[in-house]
Amino acid sequence: MTKKTVTLLVMAAGMGSRFGGLKQIEPFGPNGETILDYSVYDAASAGFGRAVIVLRRSMLADFRETVGRRIEKLLDVRYALQENDVLPAGFSVTSERARPLGTAHAVWCAREHLDTPFAVINSDDFYGGGSFGVLYGALTSPDLSACMVGYRLGNTLSETGTVNRGVCTVKNGLLVGIEERFGLDRNSGVPLDTVVSMNMWGFRPDFTDRLDRDLRAFLPAMKDPIKDELYLPGVVDGAIRDGSLSVKVLDTSEKWYGVTYREDAASLREAIKRMIAEGKYRA
């Protein structure tokens, strides 16, 4: 298989309210690199050939002038807009709604670019190079239905405050379900080697058909049209339960870094300095 047979979809339309800024273009590296710069570098090194960045229209110009110029040197980069008026024909949402419609909708908005096996990640999560390697390996396997990179809870905790995590039930290497757990830290009683989802997925192109079906069912059924969202893990869970999707859990020993809180940024900058010193990234 060639590099262009696998696509990286990056969800970058979220607002990042707790962090208090636009994390998608926040600099963390010594030369102004963002988290996404490192994710794209790791993906390109692993073998990915294309990136699809899902953004809101208001963010597009700033993003392309900063991060976009850099990552376009590494991958074939395309853009998709996640807006509340980008919907299946005949559907609409109230004009009073400001927040995006959720991560499942984000992937649906990029469907025209997803004609290859594809990975899905968050733009503001630092996943580590090894995770992209195992994900690329799975996506180039001809018998794969879908996959998820499973992190160890202890490798995803914040030193600043508690976090919410999708705790996974895994049986025979396959994902059975995900339960959202709130307020987790090292003393919350959940074993630190518990497998959790950090929204790092892999799918075949036909998964967008399932997204389309679920989005059409979700839109008229919203109880709160201002806040309700269709989440990607929820779509995956439904597909697992009805037997239409089998999700292989890929093990990673990588440490995940995020910036849930503003104070987490210093920890991430120190980690990047350390990885540069170890030769994982260029200074």
Task: Indicate where each model-derived feature is located.
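Short acidic/polar active-site loop segments enriched in Thr and Asp
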Residues: 49, 116, 145
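N-terminal glycine-rich phosphate-binding loop and ensuing alpha1 helix
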Residues: 3-68, 75-77, 82
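A short, conserved beta-strand element in the Rossmann-like catalytic core
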Residues: 16, 126-128
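Conserved core of the sugar-phosphate nucleotidyltransferase
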Residues: 128-205
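Short phosphate-binding loop-to-helix
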Residues: 71-117
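Conserved alpha/beta core of the MobA/IspD/sugar-nucleotide pyrophosphorylase nucleotidyltransferase superfamily
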Residues: 2-3, 171-172, 177-283
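Short beta-strand-to-loop acidic/aromatic patch adjacent to the donor-nucleotide binding site
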Residues: 116-126
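Hydrophobic packing residues within well-ordered alpha-helices of enzyme cores
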Residues: 63-67, 135, 211, 268
